[in-house]
Amino acid sequence: MTRPLIAMALDRRLTSSEGWPDELTDALFAPYIDLIEAAGGVAVLAASTDATLAEAHRIVELVDGVVVAGGRDVDARTYGHDPHPANDPPLRARDRLEIALTLKAIDSGKPVLGICRGMQIINVALGGTLEQHLADRVDEPDMHLNGQFVDHYVNTIPGTRVWRDLGSSLNVPSHHHQAVATLGRGLRATAHAGDGVVEAIECTGSRFIVGVQWHPERRPASTGLSIVESFVTASRRTSAVVHGHQEV
């Protein structure tokens, strides 16, 4: 059986190594790659540079699906807002690349899956906005502390893709201080936390365009491997159609 190729953008950050000064590194946390491979896909990693951005459309043509992984806050100026003081320093090159990959994949009929920041990127790419600092309004700001994942329950909406794959309620590891505010074009909220935060989105049609606000890569078996397997299956079908592969 063909393993579909899944594009993911790398993050750029300062890293330290024993005896060496800090240096900019393009990287992606290994659990994201492990999650894609556990679900049956192969990760294809793209650097968040202007050169890569110029080839974003060609990258999507070469792969079968796109995963937008977690990371720092999306630049608020991308959706027309002034940044909140609590926001991370932006990595605009990654924002631009992931938005381009997302829109090209949607235009090409290829599946898109967003995780945490990735769900927010999908929403922004389709014209939505974000709530920039949840601690300004939610009753439990400790749910989104820096430096740790916090478990909490999310409830899915019956009849949706996340409901079919994950059930009506699940306990998930979460780490974020931003969330979806207004939904992008053609998207609907399909899961919520107890504080009302949108925890999953998907397209209103039958296409596989899904985002989850939590981190399934941290506990795949109980928090999302099945939705990633569905994404990989949809990507494999795309590969079969585009490349003429025979399903076995």
Residue ranges and their predicted role:
Residues 1-111, 124, 131, 135-163, ...:
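N-terminal beta1-alpha1 cap of cysteine-dependent amidohydrolase-like domains
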Residues 114, 118, 123, 127:
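Gly/Ala-rich beta-loop-alpha elbow adjacent to hydrolase catalytic centers
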